[in-house]
Amino acid sequence: MGGLEKKKYERGSATNYITRNKARKKLQLSLPDFRRLCILKGIYPHEPKHKKKVNKGSTAARTFYLIKDIKFLLHEPIVNKFREYKVFVRKLRKAYGKSEWNAVERLKDNKPSYKLDHIVKERYPTFIDALRDLDDALSMCFLFSTFPRTGKCHVQTIQLCRRLTVEFMHYVIAARALRKVFLSIKGIYYQAEVLGQPIVWIAPYAFSHDHPTDVDYRVMATFTEFYTTLLGFVNFRLYQSLNLHYPPKIESQAQAEMKVSEDTYALDSESSMEKLAALSASLARVVVPAVEEAEADEFPTDGEVTAQEEDRRKELEAQEKHKKLFEGLKFFLNREVPREALAFIIRSFGGDVSWDKSLCIGATYDSTDSGITHQIVDRPGQQTPIIGRYYVQPQWVFDCVNARLLLPVAEYFPGVQLPPHLSPFVSEKEGDYIPPEKLKLLALQRGEDPGNLEEEEEDEDDEGDDSEGDGDVAVENEEEVVEAESEEEEEAHLSALEQQRLGGKKPQVMAGTVKLEDRQRLAQEEESEAKRLAIMMMKKREKYLYQKIMFGKRRKIREANKLAEKRKAHDDAVRSEKKAKRTRPV
């Protein structure tokens, strides 16, 4: 008895996907509008597991979307706005062609617009979800805020991104939320902890832009359109959590200090934004909260739980100390250093910062202030040093933040070769190569003084070089003596055995030396034997996986040893060069 004939590609995975062209026709949108809608709604293409089945036997390259995603887009109200905008462009073009200027003005006044608020709420049901997805939004907004006012993107978008990023930086300063900073080739990486969520973003350096031609700025502008809406909501909620005014306002005392020099910098319409962007003044609060230290209740607990709580308490104390790293210090920035990045970092850790009044609005004190403790310079020998303050290069600020302590300033004086700038985002595991600079930093964090390590190493190298010849001779003599003694013992033992064999006597028990058992070595041997037996009892798949893991560990150890050898060779070359310079006649 025959069944119904089954047709190909009418069930299974072939019915779960749809090509981009079919989806676009279903929505009645052009390709740029379809792409824009997918970006705003967070709909992305999918790669089917069986592409040939989905493509109905064809092997042509096509982009596929899930049908349920396209059905989800059918009910989006923005689709109608896109259609209205298409009609608006057609009418506007016709009015321009007929030179009907009244109609042109009327159409521009009634230009269709839309909001993305409902999409933000739809994509991020909770505030924590929005914070977890804030990395890309911040990076894109910081990038657009540095763009010049060219035809690549709208001026309003650049100004909006600048305002939102300045607002977020002010929140980080007020909440003391900054944790890590790293200078890279791409830009400056920041990590802030906002409501327990780590947020990492990158801010480009303040260089002139050379716009590449192979970048689609329309796609970037669409992402930025969504990200600015998201960041606006996030900033509003974050400011509410700290009882700060939103839009942000500068405190009345700082406002009065800046009022004296306001007219010389900008117009009234621009001065408030310039003052906010200076990052040198605190923000006004709705209600100033009373600072009370909340003490945790103590309950009788087990020993293990108590140890965990003690570790947690120490971690919180270290974090609070890190937040007040620059508290009580006054910095002055020279005009050649990156002002905004340094001001943001110093203010995030409780320090006071200022600069020359002719450089930017927002300077709070002059370079002649007697309370200045550190002056950040990047050009040696440009000014007369003032007693009572340290002159350091900008890297000192970044390294102090990552080290979580105030580093010695001797290695950061103007004109001095700077130490390597280590990344705080790298955490070494067991078996990894740890550079000597990181070991020195770890020693400083433990409270040790690694200042004389290099001198001791150099002295040891010098002593080793002086006694190198004598040591080689002594080692050779010792080896000859040991070899001679071992040969004599073997000859005596062999001759005794030969005499017993020839005499026909039974082998006698010979007196030996008592050997003490090494318990630690026996325990290691038992452990290695148990491990070997456990490996023998493994299944084939488990043994293969174990061998892969051990191979990876051995490879990591080999790479670490190779790096250590390279570093040792480099240090030896540098030491020999220094030694040659010392011994060279003047």
From Swiss-Prot:
Biased composition (Acidic residues): 451-491
Taxon lineage: Eukaryota, Metazoa, Chordata, Craniata, Vertebrata
Chief location of this protein within or outside the cell: nucleus
Stretch forming the signal peptide: none
Cross-link (Glycyl lysine isopeptide (Lys-Gly) (interchain with G-Cter in SUMO2)): K515
Job description of the protein: Component of the PeBoW complex, which is required for maturation of 28S and 5.8S ribosomal RNAs and formation of the 60S ribosome.
BP-aspect Gene Ontology terms: cell population proliferation; maturation of 5.8S rRNA from tricistronic rRNA transcript (SSU-rRNA, 5.8S rRNA, LSU-rRNA); maturation of LSU-rRNA from tricistronic rRNA transcript (SSU-rRNA, 5.8S rRNA, LSU-rRNA); nucleolus organization; protein localization to organelle; regulation of cell cycle; ribosome biogenesis; rRNA processing
Superkingdom assignment: Eukaryota
Gene name of the record: Pes1
GO cellular component, one term: preribosome, large subunit precursor
Protein name, entry field: Pescadillo homolog
